[in-house]
Amino acid sequence: MEFYYLPEEHRAIHTACFEVVRQIEKFIVGKDYLFLQVTSSELSREDKAHLDECGDIWDFLKKYKEEQFYTLLNKQLILGLLKDFCYFMQESMDCSNKMRLVVSYALLRRPIVDNLKILLRILMDESFYDNFIEKDDYDPAYMKDDELKSLLNKTDEIRFTKPITGSFIYECIYEKTNPGSVINLSNRAIHPVTTKPWNKTGSMNCNFMFTTPTDTAELWKHYYIYLPAILIFYSELFNCAVFGLFKDEVNMELYPKRLEKLAKIMETAFPKKS
């Protein structure tokens, strides 16, 4: 990997984090997971008549082939979240490497702050599908704090990396009283001026425009302190989604191999002390 302005102290973690994202990207580009992008089904003459009647493949599936409807819906949602995550994170990390930290933090907003809530709903919220399908004004990324904390805590039951708790992820991403949380720093990156009491820009200032070398060092520090835990957390949730929702199509023997690979990647960034 070629480094530009990234300080030496962050390079091992940067490299490991980039590898975690590449491992997640295997769900998009790997031949073992092609089923996420290709679904085939034979249609009888009766099915074709029903499809003509409905005029839309989604309406047809929902009315006449409900099981296939939910399978295809899950594939579209998970694949979309995977692409968002990988594409935004790769660009964010590349911008960090080039010291374009305002762009780097702005790019964290959609995949980490917003899309995580949708992934949590898919995995944990029993009412998600009814709301998503039936309500025109439903926003799955809107979530009150109590519900968000509850769903994050529920992930502790399905993940293997127990030290990275749901409550810790909340502190890293969503805690408004934490100046270094992703939501606070991404807000500052997106908006020239922020006015909330916990994230106020202040007089004679614009967010990220008067950044000193000391400020830049602190921004890098926050970025690489939280990023490994967030990526491991996300990697495990994507594993739960793919290997939980598509058991009939995925090779389940790949699951432990992915966990082993994840552990090896992180060991390169945090080697055990002898």
Language-model features, listed with the residues they occupy:
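A cross-kingdom marker of C-terminal helix-rich interaction/assembly modules
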Residues: 1-77, 95, 131-147, 181-274
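Short, charge-rich amphipathic segments
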Residues: 37-50, 81-86, 113, 159-163
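A short glycine/small-residue-enriched secondary-structure motif
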Residues: 61-66, 83-90
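Short non-catalytic regulatory patches outside canonical folded cores
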Residues: 67-78, 90-177
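Short, well-ordered alpha-helical segments
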Residues: 81-85, 176-184
